[in-house]
Amino acid sequence: TICDFSTPDSWVILSPIEQSIKRKIEAVGTPLKDWDINIYRGVLTGCNEAFIINSEKRDEILANCQTDDERNRTAELIRPILRGRDIKRYIYDWADVWLINTHNGIKGRLERIHIEDYPAVKAHLDQFWDKIKDRADQGDTPYNLRNCAYLEDFCKPKIVYPNMTKYMPFTYDEGAYLTNQKCFIITGELVAYLTAFLNSSLFKYCFRDSFPELQGGTRELSKIFFDKIPVLKVSSAIEQRFIEAVDDIQQSYTSQKAKAIDTMFFDLYNLTANECRIIGFIGIE
């Protein structure tokens, strides 16, 4: 057994073959901090019980709108939201919850939401006035969410993952969902391919211990740890193969499809049959 003391961050005990596999990955990979990607935290409301609602409450708010114009505006304002617990390997289990996205705007690009334009939403939030008026996470008014300069990134293709997790699942979203503060998102280049890599057994085998383990086996997936992960950048032709594979597995998840994507990475990194056998398939279900 070999002790790898090469980084000041952690000491990891590696067998010779484990060290061989990890060196292969690191030799050809580019640290994620040098990729054209952004990693952001989900939306903070300061009062989830007021701003995060189920479909029944959403329908009630829409029914209380006085005009079709108000109803249409309100329907656009209330967005589906994913929470950390909803994220699975490649897929997500949306829990029928919505965010009242009374955002605070983006300076020079997007005007903040004016609650006077949404009377039915205001009536709902007024029920929580004592809780929302003094909360720390608020915008220009208690009705507004705090500033979020990257709000538009939620509408882009993105990776979504929980900030605390035992199983390290990652899913891919084309832009339909916002996320709560228990999630992070990654936007930028090669995000479908990167989703596949982060879900792969290869990633978990090599880099699971790069993320600190907390009580109960939970790991903290903070940006500072992702920055150091080296990942091979690929051509658009190879990227397309992974885009198609991710799309297919999201249509109907099976462990066989996940194993097939694992094999794609084994081939991409030119791992030997013995190295592939050592890694195996790391299930997270």
PLM feature segments, named:
Residues 2-237:
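Polybasic, glycine- and aromatic-enriched phosphate-binding surface used to engage nucleic acids
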Residues 7, 21, 28-36, 120, ...:
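Non-catalytic DNA-recognition/assembly elements of restriction-modification systems
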